[in-house]
Amino acid sequence: MAHPGRRGYDNREIVLKYIHYKLSQRGYDWAAGEDRPPVPPAPAPAAAPAAVAAAGASSHHRPEPPGSAAASEVPPAEGLRPAPPGVHLALRQAGDEFSRRYQRDFAQMSGQLHLTPFTAHGRFVAVVEELFRDGVNWGRIVAFFEFGGVMCVESVNREMSPLVDNIATWMTEYLNRHLHNWIQDNGGWDAFVELYGNSMRPLFDFSWISLKTILSLVLVGACITLGAYLGHK
């Protein structure tokens, strides 16, 4: 249930701290950027974004060169609050569980991304729009964060660290424009913590998905329905 009059937590802060955590797991030191102003949630679109059939078909989404994280210059939005530690902890634990279940797939997927400063945005858009094409649930949101983390780690591995700021911006913008209302309507991040952040047992109720499978199908131009792979929460 949404909380009237409450805009929720600052999604950008949640993204930045998650990315910082994922990079620190690999021994990379990246500033979480708490001093960066938040990106205000945008009005919900009239219709869900159309799925991108292939990364090569993502010409509708112009790639952004490194350093073009325009959203980081948006002034702070009133009503956004920093998320409490429990939100960050629950999300990290959920992402780690996802990663453990698909450790081999993640290793293979990193080699398939073929990231460059001018392909990264197309890869991100194709996979994320495909991920949520069949709807939203908490499991898919966790997958979204973990995929973003993989992209950031791969960017640093390939000595393209400036891409990390861009990926953080793309994740924040997608959360604000396409996922914020769903999150608020389902109790906000506090509900996520209540449902999945204490015993961690309910995490096994997620119908997880191999992100490698999504990525592979997107890259070869297959248009898939994720309902066959990822169930509802």
Swiss-Prot record:
In adult chicken expressed, in thymus, spleen, kidney, heart, ovary and brain, with the highest levels in the thymus. In the embryo, highly levels expressed in all tissues with high levels in the bursa of Fabricius. This is Apoptosis regulator Bcl-2. It is a single-pass membrane protein. The chain crosses the membrane at residues 208-228. The BH4 motif is required for anti-apoptotic activity and for interaction with RAF-1. The keyword Cytoplasm applies. A motif (BH1) lies at residues 130-149. A motif (BH4) lies at residues 10-30. It is found in: Mitochondrion outer membrane; Nucleus membrane; Endoplasmic reticulum membrane; Cytoplasm.
